[in-house]
Amino acid sequence: VESQIKYGWECNYYALGDLVDIINQVTEEEIDAKMKEYTDKYTMKTDRIDSVREQAKYEVGLEKFLSANGIGAFADTFQDLHGLKQLPGIAAQNLMGKGIGFGPEGDYKISALSAVLMKMSEGKEGATGFIEDYTYDLTPGQELELASHMLEVPPAFAATKPEIDVLPLG
């Protein structure tokens, strides 16, 4: 409530089923158009094109949902995938590239902050974005820093053409 009072931010909950209804209305033509964007933007390093097409469907539907509701930032969570086969990782990547804030695991504060940072850095490619990173090996001399297990890494962070590689979890 305080962030709404101080900054005018609203933190609304929408049932995932409402988004799924929109995603299920996405046409094959819309998916094909999004896939064309993907093949222009990414190197396809997978034979699992059905999984990538599912991501394209999610991106089209999510963008429609956000636009229709005037939403400038969003979060998702592993615990709430009702009606979805996967998390919308590529959608999150590309929507961040369009200035939409993102936060993982339902973290509305990070999604709002990332939206503000993206607004501040408009016109400066790769200036900001979100990556859920961590350091998980603290063995002296073998420290591993800036590892990420999430799919939402913005393509703007890449030094070369980013790749789509679909790998099984586990």
Model-derived features: where do they sit?
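Internal metal/ion-chelating core segments
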Residues: 1-68
